[in-house]
Amino acid sequence: MARGVNKVILVGGVKAKPEIKNFQDGTSYTRLDLATNKEWKDKEGKPQSKTEWHRVVLFGGLADVAVRWLDSGSQIYLEGELQTRKWQDKDGIDRWTTEIRANEMTMLGSSKN
């Protein structure tokens, strides 16, 4: 079987201050929404932009750093992998979530800089 590559690299802004949360099995993590922006000019030369939102999860020491230092508007560089996980909602219905599991993060500053 061929070896695959699953790597995500993003640079963007944090939507809101992250908080520690727990999965149903008790595992703690931090989840944040990260915005990346694409800018271009249309055929008439008018500036256009689009914001893409990415769901990111961080575990362990990386989660602790995120909770302690990141705030709304913080700019970060992160690397991770795309993962889809199955979970059950409060009614017992199976759901799936696709997110980026970060394994490296560098703080770049805030949106105020």
Regions found by a protein language model. Name each.
Residues 1-113:
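Single-stranded nucleic acid-binding surfaces, predominantly the OB-fold ssDNA-binding core
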